[in-house]
Amino acid sequence: MKRANKFKLTLLGVGVLGLAACGEAKEEALTYPSVEACVKAGVTDEATCEAEFTKAQNLHNQVAPRYASSGNCYSDYGYNRCYQNRMSGGSVWLPFMMGYMLAPRGGSVFTQPLYRTSGDPNRFYTSGGGRVGAATADGRTKVAKSQTRQPRARTRTVARGGFGRRATSAGS
């Protein structure tokens, strides 16, 4: 096969994958910056709002993006939006949890922490970097079905070099 044909096939494959991602099924979810906002919305009761917030906080410690330095974290999430978390194997920098998402899943509720980036501080993002759509006044939004799956625990730390260096990721 000629080089040009391989290139066209590659572009076609990328295009199909891109369209598949755009057409991903959406599910309704609830997003809130705090327990108080969840309670005020009136969609669920206070006990549920508190319990799901606690679940999101616990999950945050496992799935939050990890950084080797404050500067790297601040670059992605904004100045003073990160904190140092000392662990048995050393310490890492994590972004603050800025909200949480509740998504009905069968007879239960799936919950995960949400973050705000420095480049888009008015939107929520999942720990995997998925952008969460704008919510209505009561917190309702539509998210890609893939964003309502359990995020993977983070075992890697992001580190970036200076001018002319590459970003690296190391297991923790």
Language model features by range: what are they?
Residues 2-5, 11-15, 23-172:
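Low-complexity, glycine/proline/serine-enriched intrinsically disordered segments
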